[in-house]
Amino acid sequence: MSSKTKSVTAVLIVLALVAGVGMTKAGSKYKTQEKVNLIFANVTSNSAKKAGEKFKELVEEYSDGDITVDLFQDNQLGDDKTAAEGVQNGDIDIAVSSSSSLSTLYKDYYIYDTPYLFLNSQEVYDVGFDGKAAQEMLKGVSKVGLKHMAMWENGFRNYTNNDHAIETPADCKGQKIRTMENPIHLKAWKSIGANPTPMAFSELFTAMQQGTVDGEENPIGIIYSNRFYEVQKYISLTQHVYTPYVVVMNPDKYDSLTDEQQKIIDKAMNCLLYTSDA
């Protein structure tokens, strides 16, 4: 074999090896994905719990079990604000939080706490979820170490109490109503003469049972799933504020996933937009 022939043969062997390595990498890009486990913190509402269960089912189905979801329902990892903070520091991968609770971390979410900003669910979906201004606003959540994933249906807030039905704002005067530590909520209730009392959600049932507060306000799904009807006589369909659930994810966790895994997570989230049983 001439030296020229040897050189050509050597080049061809090298090219074949390089091509082979390239084909192996390309061909195995998604077949050799690292298995991923996601810690998912959820709230007490039936609608969110069902959505969380469906998300787990879809993700594990789409990934053929390469992605598993550990679902912690009923605020097992803390209330929704605590869970969102857990997502910020990386202890929790995904969490569901009401926009009202999340607004303490990202103030633009306060927009959803404006009384009677939305009059029906369709307005919420068209403007509050999918509108151009809303989409721009939601991008900003990345500034506080969270990745906005989706909005889930929660519902309009309604008023319950033990004294009388509420027909006009004046009927709330003097009533001690449990609220979140939310400046917009506090100012709104004070403006109509009520006595807003910030209190942890976990303490609310006992507080109403013992008469520490006269009433509370929440979406129907939360009122029902927490059996507030056992300690409250009246419910008034005031529908004064729409409070969506916001699903957030730790951005570093999301970025650590392969493109295919990210597509699976996004697809499952998109299947659950506007999910509700209330």
Q: What spans do the regions from the language model cover?
A:
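N-terminal secretory/targeting leader peptides
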Residues: 5-123, 141-276
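N-terminal secretory signal peptides that target proteins for export/translocation
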Residues: 1-3
